[in-house]
Amino acid sequence: MPRKHTYLNVYQTGKLTVVSFVSAEHLDQIIVSECRAEIAELIKQHACEVLAFDLTGVKLVPSGMLGMLASLGRLGVQVLVYNPSDEIREVLEITRLDSLLQVQHVEV
């Protein structure tokens, strides 16, 4: 039976794993350490090499969550960010996180 994820919707698994956040409008309520543990388990379980976060509809990403996304490279995966809002894209550029997190627009 597939594992129920607390924080993530998992759309695709394998070398490219695509996820979104269960509660896209309430990312500020996520416990970052628990979310990171869930992501680490997902990476290991599916031998993930590229992890893509679909941010479609997300309006705000708390700084702790941005730090967590940036730190995922230490787990040996490339991190992609799909469809960030203009505001989130601007924050990624200002903080230079766009050099660690590859930003892409994809059709959903």
Map each language-model feature to its residues.
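Short acidic-hydrophobic, aromatic-tinged amphipathic segments that line or gate anion-handling sites
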Residues: 100-108
